[in-house]
Curated annotation (Swiss-Prot):
Family to which this protein belongs: Belongs to the multicopper oxidase family.
GO terms for biological process, alphabetical: lignin catabolic process
Record organism: Trametes versicolor (White-rot fungus)
Record protein name field: Laccase-4
Residues binding Cu cation 3, per UniProt: H133, H423, H473
Enzyme class: oxidoreductase
Gene (name only): LCC4
Length: 520
């Protein structure tokens, strides 16, 4: 325990300067607790992993077995005392029980207890993240970066540096606990980059600093840990060459700005080819205070040898903004199925709606079951109608091509664009936001899709090769809380043959169900 405590202390010190902490993993403890933090100069209670925000960087190599023991020491009932952690982007083949979505894949971990997540990064590498998947708890702080390195990275010759110093996290930060604030906040109080930021009208607190050496090439890993807004990200005076989207390698694509939605990740190569100086890093949110006055929504790119002062660089108009449709997967780029809309084994159209309080998909608002879907399946329930109320769960056949469409009208999806995340898979986006064109030859492939605005009909495809119940939901956490989700039960009959939960997993529900309401 002494070595672990020392690591936590070191992590806290490093985070105070807006740098990503020393990496932990793939075998590690992750202690979840409450503490007061002031990342933008305003002090509030938060939910933290290992005592820091964002949570510590967890790393491993392609093929590694991750064993992460989550210890729940939460005591503040306003932000929930229970927790459940989702390892965003991992397929969890054969370990659906470790996916972490509360009441879909497990019961929450009760305060005073621990739970070991044990899964393997089989054939996966890239940029991931982890966060609470219980109510809106991650908005209160429980979110952090995760990287799986590939010793045989096909893009390795494009960069010189790829380590904890090249992680860039974007987070919306609220001065009020999620359960005490508005159901649908109109913007956050501040944007935090690597855990630091300023809020409008606040003090000029320290900004995060990312240091580079002139002449070197850096693989920057950009992660949106957002609960709500999307961001337009840029670095004054520098282009960015994207090589990865959501842990999928893509052909290099050079841009000067990236619009990134909640849950999405990008790797881009930044060449430090400018004068030795300080340059603003900018993350303009889609809601809230949408300016850079006084250094808000900003961080600093500092060349070694530059003065330790705020930059004086100015924002310029983007001339090479990212168009998602221009991203081409490096390997096996073709979408599954036939090259026409509907040319799949199973096509599903998802109609959205909102009644002022709840979101609906095909006229149903998702309500978490009291018994997790996976537990129901393993207990012998296989009918979609028996697992969840009609319309909340769709049974998908095995080894089939699936097409999902998200038509958006002027009235059916307030708060658009909505970023939708599918657990257990990546998918090909055969029709992207802002376009009526289709691409079945080499469409972008990822695990979070911007479903666009009025007139869009974003369409994705994937293949059912991963038995289990998988969540599909809006990654604006306030919208998920309001029912904006469905569950796919994939190859339901084979789940019991491919998924063997741990004994500790089986104990989660009896322990959670025995809690007093004040300890939930």
């Amino acid at each position: 325990m002494g070595r672990f405590s020392s690591l936590c202390a070191l992590t806290a010190v490093i985070h105070s300067f807006g740098r990503v902490s020393a990496a932990i993993g793939p075998v590690t403890d992750l202690t979840i607790s409450n503490a007061d933090v002031s990342p933008d100069g305003f002090t509030r209670a938060a939910v933290l992993a290992n005592g820091v925000f964002p949570g510590p960087l967890i790393t491993g190599n392609k093929g590694d077995n991750f064993q992460i023991n989550v210890i729940d020491n939460l005591s503040n009932e306003t932000m929930l005392k229970s927790t459940s952690i989702h390892w965003h982007g991992f397929f969890q083949k054969g370990t659906n029980w470790a996916d972490g979505a509360a009441f879909v894949n497990q019961c929450p971990i009760a305060t005073g207890n621990s739970f070991l997540y044990d899964f393997t990064a089989t054939d996966q590498a890239g940029t991931f993240w982890y966060h609470s998947h219980l109510s809106t708890q991650y908005c209160d702080g429980l979110r952090g970066p995760m990287v799986v390195y590939d010793p045989s990275d096909p893009h390795a010759d494009l960069y010189d540096v790829d380590d904890e110093t090249t992680i860039i996290t974007l987070s919306d930060w609220y001065h009020t606990a999620a359960s005490l604030g508005a159901a649908f906040p109109i913007g956050s109080d501040s944007t935090l980059i690597n855990g630091l930021g300023r809020f409008a009208g606040g003090d000029s607190t320290d900004l995060a600093v990312i240091t580079v050496e002139q002449g070197k090439r850096y693989r920057m890993r950009l992660l949106s840990l957002s609960c709500d807004p999307n961001y337009v990200f840029s670095i004054d005076g520098h282009n960015m060459t994207i090589i990865e989207a959501d842990a999928v390698n893509h052909e290099p694509l050079t841009v000067d700005s990236i619009q990134i939605y909640a849950g999405q990740r990008y790797s881009f190569v930044l060449t430090a080819d400018q004068d030795i100086d300080n340059y603003f890093i900018r993350a303009l949110p889609s809601a809230g205070t949408t300016s850079f006055d006084g250094g808000i929504n900003s961080a600093i790119l500092r060349y070694s040898g530059a003065s330790e002062v705020d930059p004086t660089t100015t924002e310029t108009t983007s001339v090479l903004p990212l168009d998602e449709a221009n991203l081409v997967p490096l390997d096996s780029p073709a979408a599954p199925g036939d090259p026409n809309i509907g040319g799949v084994d199973y096509a599903l159209n998802l109609d959205f709606n909102f009644d002022g309080t709840n979101f609906f998909i095909n006229d149903v608002s998702f309500v978490s079951p009291t018994v997790p879907v996976l537990l129901q399946i393993l207990s012998g329930t296989t009918s979609a109608a028996d697992l969840l109320p009609s319309g909340s769960l769709f049974a998908l056949p095995s080894n089939s091509t699936i097409e999902i469409s998200f038509p958006i009208t002027a009235t059916n999806a307030p708060g658009a664009p909505h970023p939708f995340h599918l657990h257990g898979h990546t998918f090909s986006i055969v029709r992207t936001a802002g376009s009526t064109d289709t691409n079945f030859v080499n469409p972008v492939r990822r695990d979070v899709v911007n479903t666009g605005t009025a007139g869009d009909n974003v369409t994705i495809r994937f293949t059912t090769d991963n038995p289990g119940p998988w969540f599909l939901h809006c990654h604006i956490d306030f919208h998920l809380e309001a029912g904006f989700a469905i569950v796919f039960s994939e190859d339901t009959a084979d789940v019991s043959n491919t998924t063997t939960p741990s004994t500790a997993w089986e104990d989660l529900c009896p322990t959670y169900n025995a809690l007093d309401s004040s300890d939930l």
